[in-house]
Amino acid sequence: MLRLQSLGSLPAHAEPAWTVSFNPTRSLLASCSTDRTIRLYSYIIPSSSDGLPSQDDSQAVFSLAKVIETDHKRTVRSIAWSPDGRTLASGSFDSTVGVWEEVIPLSDDEEEEDEGAQGVYKPAGVDSDGDGDGGKEKEWECVTTLEGHESECKSVGFSSDGALLASCSRDKSVWVWEVQPDADFECIAVMMEHSQDVKSIAWHPHEEILASASYDSYIHLAYDDPDSDWCIFQKLHPSLPSTPLTIPSTSPSHLIDALVPTEEEKKAEAELQVPPLEEDETVWCLAWSPDGRWLASGGDNGGIRLWQRTGSQPDSAFKEILHTAAHSRSVFSLSWSPPYPSAESAGSTDSTDLGMLASAGEDGKIIIWQITVPPSPSSASQEIDNEQISIRPIAAQKDAHGVNDINSVAWCVREDKKGWGMLSSAGDDGSVKVWRVVRD
């Protein structure tokens, strides 16, 4: 039996917190806010056995490491780490994208010797002689500001190999930038296919395929066509009716408390204005499965949709397979973790297990879903129907940020596999919270 255990609240932002993101290689958690700052929290993970922890196991210890006072003029809406963990991108409502790196301030002597240096900084990790940094204090500095969007930047993200950076905006555009040496970025594509505000982007975990979600109710899938340039190869539009979320009476009490509404909650939910299926709904968020065969989306009606890739070619089509009722209001954030060793057989994973999907949104709930499918077919093009895929809630927390919306959830997914089952959330109350999935 699993549950969601709170590890506490971290020093909060002064205004709503919008995005949280774990560094993939270092013990750092980043958050951003309307207050225009980026906060970096360091943490120590106690040694533990493989698999998910129990509720009595030692907890990770977090501390505020740095408050970055950005030069952004408005809300910092989105942040994303590069795969090597050395670079952090920030997208702001001032229409710009900031690129941040940890650097060492040059001494006065070094400034005179290196007048050609960019600003008064050099990358952390090397000194002027090419040796180690010698314990010198490091600072996070904006090494590049990318301009081009005409309105609020809503989301940023690096491709899986770190070679590309993408951004999207209220101006209906999606930009792709090529990462070059010395903090240089070249715009290689501007896609203007959406008819409304583009809310989020998500890179495929292994390939250069970019998904974007919009207020226009569409999900666009783009890739670099070898015969031309970056282009949209499919436009996905939700169509399946939702399957009601059923919580058996035999479910753990904490799951029933979180997901089965009381009479008062039912009355309040009935008064909410949720768009019916026949009306277009905003697609707020996207998340790829770790194997790249599935794409999850969340929207205004509170449901979660799963889309299956029907082939192995870069431009293979995706098909909507499932739409399950999940939240009572808009789903603002999704995050998909790799499969974890099961409690029953630590150290092994079920080949049909797609991992855990975390969802959060306007109703203040965090829900953890387990998703399983039949074993991988011999043919990558073999499709799965909605009766074969299983999505079920295994842990949940209501009022995770009090009465406030939850704007972001993110799993701790590291190369060294430390921090399994740990995730963070950011809310309108400005707080950043940390949770973990534990075994009772």
From Swiss-Prot:
Pfam families tied to this protein: WD40 (PF00400)
WD repeats mapped onto the chain: 12-51, 71-110, 148-187, 193-233, 278-317, 326-379, 401-440
Keywords: Repeat, WD repeat
Gene Ontology terms describing biological process: iron-sulfur cluster assembly
Top-level taxon of the source organism: Eukaryota
Keyword Repeat: yes
GO cellular component, one term: cytosolic [4Fe-4S] assembly targeting complex
UniProt keyword annotation of Hydrolase present: no
Region (Disordered): 107-137
Comp. bias (Acidic residues): 107-116
Function: Essential component of the cytosolic iron-sulfur (Fe/S) protein assembly machinery. Required for the maturation of extramitochondrial Fe/S proteins.
Protein family membership: Belongs to the WD repeat CIA1 family.
Name of the protein this chain belongs to: Probable cytosolic iron-sulfur protein assembly protein 1
